[in-house]
C-alpha cells in the first residue's frame, strides 16, 4: 500500500477514535451541561390570586414572642420557663392561634368586611397558686397584645383541675430522674445481673391514662433496653413500676407497686431481697446487639440503581405565599395546631368554597396485653401534640424530592419559640394511574384519558413509637381526600407467660410480644356546599321484583334508588355496626343543569371500628369513637370532639362528644360532619423493625355529587385524545408525545439538607 495512503488512513482512524472518546466523555458529563428545564408558571384564573388574609395562619415567631412577653409582664414575677418548671411552679405551657369565629371570618372573606382581630390562646399551668389549676387565656390583639381574658369556664364549663394538665417534657424528665436516683438504686444487684443495667442501658416507656379515679396521677412505667441506634420499643425487660407522681414536690413521689414476670411486689427493695435470697424466678435479658432486628440501618450496601423518583420537569403548578396555596383549580390555607396537627381552611374549587374547615381532631390507640403498663394504654395523642411532634420531613422519602418544604414555629413546653424545619410539605403527586380513560372500538376508534394527579399537603406526627402520615389531597375532579398512614415501631410487652400471652398478640422476638391494639382517627368536616344552608341526604339501592313490560310472564329483579332526607342529628348519627347509607351527602337547595341538588358525598375508607365498650368508665371521654359518621349543626361552642385534658382524666370529661347529638334539626343549617376512620392492628413478624404503610391506611373522600354539570377534569390541559387516523406520536396531537423533548433538560432540584435531628 502507498505510504501516503497508509498514513492518511491512520490519521483518519486517530481522528475517529478521538471523536468517539470526546463524545463519550462529554456525554458522561452531559447531565451537568444539559439545559435546565424551563419553569412554566401555573395558569392564571380569576380565582388563583392568593388570599392576603392571615385569618388561619399559624402565629409567627414575632407574634409568639410578643404574647410571651405580654404574659410574663402581666402574670407576675413568679412565672417560670416551662422548660425548667417543677409541678409546683407557674408557667406558660403553650401559645397558639385562637381561631376566629366563623361568622366574622366569612364577613371578611366573602363580603369584604374588616378582618377579625387576630388573637392567641395561651394555656397556663398555675401550680404555684393556693388552689393549683390550669387556665386558658385569649391574648390580643396581635401583633401588639394589650389585653387577655380568661376563657376557661366558657370553654370547659368550669375551672380545670391541675391534675388534668397534659404531661410535658419536664415532667417526663423528672420522672426518669426520680426512678434513676431514688427507686432503681433499691435493687442494684437484680438490675445489674438480670437486666444488664449499668446506669444508662434502660429507658422508661409509660402508659396513660394515669390512674383509675379522677384526681389520680399514677402511671405504670415499663423499662426497656436502650442502646443508641436501636428502637427501644422492641426491647422490654419485664420490669414495670407504678409511680404516683401527683404530688407537687417530686421528692414526695413514690412507687406504689412493682410488676415482674407476672407477680406484683410492694417496691424494688422487696424484689431485690427476694432475688438475693433465691426466691425470685428471673429471666436474664442480654443487651441487644447494635445490628439487631430493631435497627433501621440498611442491611445491604447502597447500590444503584436508585428507586424511582418523581419529578415535575416544568416546575410546580401551584404557588405558596405564607400559608395560602393556590393552583389552577384549588385554593386553600393550611394551619398546624400544636395539639391537633394539620388542618386546612377556606377550601375552594375554581373559586367556589367547598369546605370552611377540614381538620384532624384526635388520634387514639387502645392496647391489650398481660402486663399492667400495656393493658392500661389509651393514648390520646393530641395531648402530646400532633403538631408539636411533627418533625422535619426528608426529601425523596417522606415527600417527593421536589416538594415545597414549609417551616413551622411552635411555643409549647418552653418559654421560647421552637422551629420545626420542613415539618409540612406541599407537592403534586402523580399516581401512575389513569384518572379516567376509554379505548373505544364500537362505532368509532379513539382513545381518551387523563393521568391521575393531585395536590397534596402533608405532615408526619412522630408521637412516641408511632409515626402518622397525614395527607390532604385535592383532585382535579373537585374531590378532596384525607388519608392517614401508620408506620413506626410497634409497642411491645415482655412475654413472661406462655400460651396465655398469645391471647394479646404475636411473638415477634425473643420473649417479645407485639401487643394487639386499635387505631382510631377523628376528623372534622365543616362543609359549605354552595353556601351555609345544607341538608343531609341518604341514598341507597334495593332490588325490587318487576314484570317485564314486554312480557308480563317474565320477572326481573331491578335495582331501584331509595332516598331519605335526614332531618335530625340523631338520624344522622351512625354508630359502628349500624348500616351506613352507601351514598350520604350534604346538599344545597341549588340545582345543577339537570335539576339535581348540588351536593358533596362523604365516602369513608375504613374497616369496621373496634370501640371501647359503652360500659367502660373511660368511654364518655372517647365517645366520638362510637360513630363512623355523625352530622351536627355547627356551633362555635363545639369546636373540637376531644380535649387534651381527657388524657389524664378520662372518667369525668367536661365536654362529651356524644352530647353534641341532641336531635336538633339538620334542615337548611350550617352543618359539620364528624368522621372516624379506624383499624385493628395485630402485630406480626413483618412489623419488625417497623410497621409499613402498605395496608395501614384509612381516610375519607369528599366527592362532588351532582355539584357540577359534568366531570370538571375534562377541562384539564393534560387530557389525551386521539383517533385511529391521527398520528399519536405528534406533539401537536398528543401532549404525552412531548415528553421525550422535555426529557432532554435537567429538572430544577434543590440540594438535599436535613435539620431534624
From Swiss-Prot:
<dbReference type="InterPro" id="IPR016182">
    <property type="entry name" value="Cu_amine_oxidase_N-reg"/>
</dbReference>
<dbReference type="Pfam" id="PF02727">
    <property type="entry name" value="Cu_amine_oxidN2"/>
</dbReference>
<keyword id="KW-0325">Glycoprotein</keyword>
<dbReference type="InterPro" id="IPR036460">
    <property type="entry name" value="Cu_amine_oxidase_C_sf"/>
</dbReference>
<comment type="subunit">
    <text>Homodimer; disulfide-linked. Probably forms heterodimers with AOC3.</text>
</comment>
<dbReference type="InterPro" id="IPR015802">
    <property type="entry name" value="Cu_amine_oxidase_N3"/>
</dbReference>
<feature type="binding site">
    <location>
        <position position="664"/>
    </location>
    <ligand>
        <name>Ca(2+) 2</name>
    </ligand>
</feature>
<feature type="disulfide bond">
    <location>
        <begin position="399"/>
        <end position="425"/>
    </location>
</feature>
<feature type="binding site">
    <location>
        <position position="660"/>
    </location>
    <ligand>
        <name>Ca(2+) 2</name>
    </ligand>
</feature>
<protein>
    <recommendedName>
        <fullName>Amine oxidase [copper-containing] 2</fullName>
        <ecNumber>1.4.3.21</ecNumber>
    </recommendedName>
</protein>
<dbReference type="GO" id="GO:0005507">
    <property type="term" value="F:copper ion binding"/>
</dbReference>
<keyword id="KW-1015">Disulfide bond</keyword>
<feature type="topological domain" description="Cytoplasmic">
    <location>
        <begin position="1"/>
        <end position="4"/>
    </location>
</feature>
<keyword id="KW-0472">Membrane</keyword>
<dbReference type="GO" id="GO:0048038">
    <property type="term" value="F:quinone binding"/>
</dbReference>
<keyword id="KW-0106">Calcium</keyword>
<keyword id="KW-0801">TPQ</keyword>
<keyword id="KW-0560">Oxidoreductase</keyword>
<dbReference type="InterPro" id="IPR015800">
    <property type="entry name" value="Cu_amine_oxidase_N2"/>
</dbReference>
<comment type="function">
    <text>Catalyzes the oxidative deamination of primary amines to the corresponding aldehydes with the concomitant production of hydrogen peroxide and ammonia. Has a preference for 2-phenylethylamine, tryptamine and tyramine. Could also act on methylamine and benzylamine but much less efficiently.</text>
</comment>
<dbReference type="GO" id="GO:0006584">
    <property type="term" value="P:catecholamine metabolic process"/>
</dbReference>
<keyword id="KW-1003">Cell membrane</keyword>
<dbReference type="Pfam" id="PF02728">
    <property type="entry name" value="Cu_amine_oxidN3"/>
</dbReference>
<dbReference type="InterPro" id="IPR049947">
    <property type="entry name" value="Cu_Am_Ox_Cu-bd"/>
</dbReference>
<feature type="binding site">
    <location>
        <position position="681"/>
    </location>
    <ligand>
        <name>Cu(2+)</name>
    </ligand>
</feature>
<feature type="binding site">
    <location>
        <position position="519"/>
    </location>
    <ligand>
        <name>Cu(2+)</name>
    </ligand>
</feature>
<feature type="binding site">
    <location>
        <position position="528"/>
    </location>
    <ligand>
        <name>Ca(2+) 1</name>
    </ligand>
</feature>
<feature type="binding site">
    <location>
        <position position="638"/>
    </location>
    <ligand>
        <name>Ca(2+) 2</name>
    </ligand>
</feature>
<dbReference type="GO" id="GO:0005886">
    <property type="term" value="C:plasma membrane"/>
</dbReference>
<keyword id="KW-0128">Catecholamine metabolism</keyword>
<keyword id="KW-1133">Transmembrane helix</keyword>
<feature type="binding site">
    <location>
        <position position="527"/>
    </location>
    <ligand>
        <name>Ca(2+) 1</name>
    </ligand>
</feature>
<comment type="similarity">
    <text>Belongs to the copper/topaquinone oxidase family.</text>
</comment>
<feature type="modified residue" description="2',4',5'-topaquinone">
    <location>
        <position position="466"/>
    </location>
</feature>
<feature type="disulfide bond">
    <location>
        <begin position="731"/>
        <end position="738"/>
    </location>
</feature>
<feature type="active site" description="Proton acceptor">
    <location>
        <position position="381"/>
    </location>
</feature>
<feature type="binding site">
    <location>
        <position position="569"/>
    </location>
    <ligand>
        <name>Ca(2+) 2</name>
    </ligand>
</feature>
<feature type="binding site">
    <location>
        <position position="670"/>
    </location>
    <ligand>
        <name>Ca(2+) 1</name>
    </ligand>
</feature>
<keyword id="KW-0812">Transmembrane</keyword>
<feature type="glycosylation site" description="N-linked (GlcNAc...) asparagine">
    <location>
        <position position="226"/>
    </location>
</feature>
<feature type="binding site">
    <location>
        <position position="517"/>
    </location>
    <ligand>
        <name>Cu(2+)</name>
    </ligand>
</feature>
<feature type="glycosylation site" description="N-linked (GlcNAc...) asparagine">
    <location>
        <position position="663"/>
    </location>
</feature>
Amino acid at each position: 500500500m502507498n505510504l501516503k495512503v497508509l498514513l492518511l488512513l491512520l490519521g483518519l482512524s486517530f481522528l475517529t477514535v478521538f471523536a468517539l472518546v470526546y463524545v463519550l466523555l462529554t456525554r458522561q458529563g452531559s447531565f451537568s451541561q444539559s439545559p435546565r428545564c424551563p419553569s412554566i408558571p401555573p395558569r392564571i384564573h380569576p380565582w388563583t390570586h392568593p388570599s392576603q388574609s392571615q385569618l388561619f395562619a399559624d402565629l409567627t415567631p414575632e407574634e409568639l414572642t410578643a404574647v410571651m412577653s405580654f404574659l410574663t409582664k402581666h402574670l407576675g414575677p413568679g412565672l417560670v420557663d416551662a422548660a425548667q418548671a417543677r409541678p409546683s411552679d407557674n408557667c406558660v405551657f403553650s401559645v397558639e392561634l385562637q381561631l376566629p369565629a366563623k361568622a366574622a371570618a366569612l364577613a371578611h372573606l366573602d363580603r369584604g368586611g374588616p378582618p377579625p382581630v387576630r388573637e392567641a390562646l395561651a394555656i397556663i399551668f398555675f401550680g404555684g397558686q393556693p388552689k393549683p389549676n390550669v387556665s386558658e387565656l385569649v391574648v390580643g390583639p396581635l401583633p401588639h397584645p394589650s389585653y387577655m381574658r380568661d376563657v376557661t369556664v366558657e370553654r370547659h364549663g368550669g375551672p380545670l383541675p391541675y391534675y388534668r394538665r397534659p404531661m410535658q417534657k419536664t415532667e417526663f424528665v423528672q420522672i426518669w430522674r426520680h426512678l434513676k436516683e431514688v427507686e432503681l438504686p433499691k435493687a442494684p444487684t437484680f438490675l445489674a445481673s438480670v437486666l444488664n443495667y449499668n446506669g444508662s442501658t434502660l429507658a422508661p416507656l409509660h402508659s396513660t391514662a394515669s390512674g383509675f379515679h379522677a384526681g389520680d396521677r399514677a402511671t405504670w412505667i415499663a423499662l426497656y433496653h436502650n442502646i443508641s441506634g436501636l428502637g427501644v420499643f422492641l426491647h422490654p425487660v419485664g420490669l414495670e413500676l407504678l409511680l404516683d407522681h401527683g404530688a407537687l414536690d417530686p421528692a414526695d413521689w413514690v412507687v406504689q407497686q412493682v410488676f415482674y414476670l407476672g407477680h406484683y411486689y410492694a417496691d424494688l427493695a422487696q424484689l431485690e431481697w427476694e432475688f438475693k435470697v433465691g426466691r425470685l424466678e428471673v429471666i436474664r435479658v442480654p443487651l441487644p446487639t447494635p445490628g439487631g432486628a430493631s435497627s433501621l440501618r440498611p442491611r445491604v450496601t447502597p447500590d444503584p440503581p436508585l428507586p424511582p423518583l418523581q419529578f415535575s420537569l416544568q416546575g410546580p403548578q401551584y404557588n405558596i405565599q405564607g400559608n395560602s396555596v393556590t393552583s389552577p383549580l384549588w385554593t386553600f390555607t393550611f394551619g398546624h395546631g400544636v395539639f391537633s396537627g394539620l388542618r386546612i381552611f377556606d377550601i375552594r374549587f375554581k373559586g367556589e368554597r367547598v369546605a370552611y374547615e377540614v381538620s384532624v381532631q384526635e388520634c387514639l390507640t387502645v392496647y391489650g396485653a398481660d402486663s399492667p403498663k400495656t393493658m392500661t394504654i389509651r393514648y390520646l395523642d393530641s395531648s402530646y401534640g400532633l403538631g408539636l411532634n411533627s418533625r422535619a420531613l426528608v426529601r425523596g422519602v417522606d415527600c417527593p424530592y421536589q416538594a415545597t418544604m414549609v417551616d413551622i414555629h411552635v411555643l409549647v413546653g418552653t418559654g421560647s419559640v421552637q422551629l420545626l424545619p420542613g415539618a409540612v410539605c406541599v407537592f403534586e403527586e402523580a399516581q401512575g394511574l389513569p384518572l379516567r380513560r376509554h379505548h373505544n372500538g364500537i362505532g368509532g376508534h379513539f382513545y381518551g384519558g387523563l393521568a391521575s394527579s393531585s395536590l397534596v399537603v402533608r405532615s408526619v406526627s412522630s408521637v412516641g413509637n408511632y409515626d402518622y402520615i397525614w395527607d390532604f389531597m385535592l383532585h382535579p375532579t373537585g374531590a378532596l381526600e384525607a388519608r392517614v398512614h401508620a408506620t413506626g415501631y410497634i409497642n411491645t410487652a415482655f412475654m413472661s407467660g406462655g400460651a396465655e400471652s398469645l391471647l394479646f398478640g404475636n411473638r415477634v422476638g425473643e420473649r417479645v410480644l407485639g401487643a394487639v391494639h386499635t387505631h382510631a382517627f377523628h376528623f372534622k368536616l365543616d362543609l359549605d356546599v354552595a353556601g351555609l344552608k345544607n341538608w343531609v341526604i341518604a341514598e341507597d339501592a334495593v332490588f325490587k321484583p318487576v314484570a317485564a313490560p314486554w312480557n308480563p310472564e317474565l320477572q326481573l329483579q331491578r335495582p331501584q334508588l331509595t332516598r331519605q332526607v335526614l332531618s335530625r342529628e340523631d338520624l344522622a348519627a351512625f354508630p359502628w355496626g349500624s348500616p351506613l347509607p352507601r351514598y350520604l351527602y350534604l346538599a344545597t337547595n341549588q340545582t345543577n343543569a339537570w335539576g339535581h341538588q348540588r351536593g358533596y358525598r362523604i365516602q369513608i375508607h375504613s374497616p369496621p371500628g373496634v370501640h371501647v365498650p359503652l360500659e367502660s368508665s373511660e368511654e364518655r371521654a372517647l365517645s366520638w369513637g362510637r360513630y363512623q359518621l355523625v352530622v351536627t349543626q355547627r356551633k362555635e361552642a363545639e369546636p373540637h370532639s376531644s380535649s387534651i385534658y381527657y388524657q389524664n382524666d378520662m372518667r369525668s370529661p367536661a365536654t362529651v362528644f356524644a352530647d353534641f347529638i341532641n336531635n336538633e334539626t339538620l334542615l337548611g343549617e350550617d352543618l359539620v360532619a364528624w368522621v372516624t376512620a379506624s383499624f385493628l392492628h395485630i402485630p406480626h413478624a413483618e412489623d419488625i423493625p417497623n410497621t409499613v404503610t402498605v395496608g395501614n391506611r384509612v381516610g375519607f373522600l369528599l366527592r362532588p355529587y351532582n355539584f357540577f354539570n359534568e366531570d370538571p377534569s375534562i377541562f384539564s390541559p393534560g387530557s389525551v385524545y386521539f383517533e385511529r387516523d391521527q398520528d399519536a406520536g405528534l406533539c401537536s396531537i398528543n401532549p404525552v408525545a412531548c415528553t421525550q423533548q422535555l426529557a432532554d433538560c435537567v429538572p430544577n432540584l434543590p440540594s438535599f439538607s436535613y435539620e431534624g435531628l
